[in-house]
UniProtKB/Swiss-Prot annotation:
<dbReference type="GO" id="GO:0005886">
    <property type="term" value="C:plasma membrane"/>
</dbReference>
<feature type="topological domain" description="Cytoplasmic">
    <location>
        <begin position="122"/>
        <end position="128"/>
    </location>
</feature>
<keyword id="KW-0472">Membrane</keyword>
<keyword id="KW-0813">Transport</keyword>
<feature type="topological domain" description="Cytoplasmic">
    <location>
        <begin position="57"/>
        <end position="77"/>
    </location>
</feature>
<keyword id="KW-0444">Lipid biosynthesis</keyword>
<feature type="topological domain" description="Periplasmic">
    <location>
        <begin position="99"/>
        <end position="100"/>
    </location>
</feature>
<protein>
    <recommendedName>
        <fullName>Probable 4-amino-4-deoxy-L-arabinose-phosphoundecaprenol flippase subunit ArnF</fullName>
    </recommendedName>
</protein>
<feature type="transmembrane region" description="Helical">
    <location>
        <begin position="78"/>
        <end position="98"/>
    </location>
</feature>
<feature type="transmembrane region" description="Helical">
    <location>
        <begin position="3"/>
        <end position="23"/>
    </location>
</feature>
<feature type="transmembrane region" description="Helical">
    <location>
        <begin position="101"/>
        <end position="121"/>
    </location>
</feature>
<comment type="subunit">
    <text>Heterodimer of ArnE and ArnF.</text>
</comment>
<dbReference type="InterPro" id="IPR022832">
    <property type="entry name" value="Flippase_ArnF"/>
</dbReference>
<comment type="pathway">
    <text>Bacterial outer membrane biogenesis; lipopolysaccharide biosynthesis.</text>
</comment>
<dbReference type="GO" id="GO:1901505">
    <property type="term" value="F:carbohydrate derivative transmembrane transporter activity"/>
</dbReference>
<keyword id="KW-0812">Transmembrane</keyword>
<comment type="function">
    <text>Translocates 4-amino-4-deoxy-L-arabinose-phosphoundecaprenol (alpha-L-Ara4N-phosphoundecaprenol) from the cytoplasmic to the periplasmic side of the inner membrane.</text>
</comment>
Length: 128
């Protein structure tokens, strides 16, 4: 059950990260404070996506809280690295995100996935 909550947290945090990235690229820069505030108050699509991202992070924290009650911290914390993998893949697959493929990033993803496999694969008991 803890693993399920952890995966929910990772997926929701990844979607929230993508939402915040989209909003940040479409909202006026914070250096133009009045334009930024006016855009937020107009509550257009960009502002709603920003709010969705923030609420997603809040929901992700709730799932993380539930994860920590059911799963050892050493395993739970390792799950967070999956968010990097999901965001990287989504930025390349989703249209308009402009994510780029590189061997360096692929190597990083391979390291993350290898580490997760080492942590989560069951161990065999040795008899002495």
């Amino acid at each position: 059950m803890g693993l399920m909550w952890g995966l929910f947290s990772v997926i929701i945090a990844s979607v929230a990260q993508l939402s915040l990235g989209f909003a940040a690229s479409h909202l006026p820069p914070m250096t133009h404070l009045w334009d930024f505030i006016a855009t937020l108050l107009a509550f257009g699509l960009d502002a709603r996506i920003l709010l969705l991202g923030l609420l997603g992070y809040l929901l992700s924290v709730f799932c993380w809280y539930k994860t920590l009650h059911k799963l050892a911290l050493s395993k739970a914390y390792a799950l967070l690295s999956m968010s990097y993998v999901l965001v990287w893949i989504a930025s390349m697959v989703l249209p308009g995100w402009g994510g780029t493929f590189s061997l360096k990033a692929l190597l990083g993803v391979a390291c993350i996935m290898s580490g997760l496999m080492l942590i989560f694969l069951p161990t065999t008991k040795q008899r002495y």
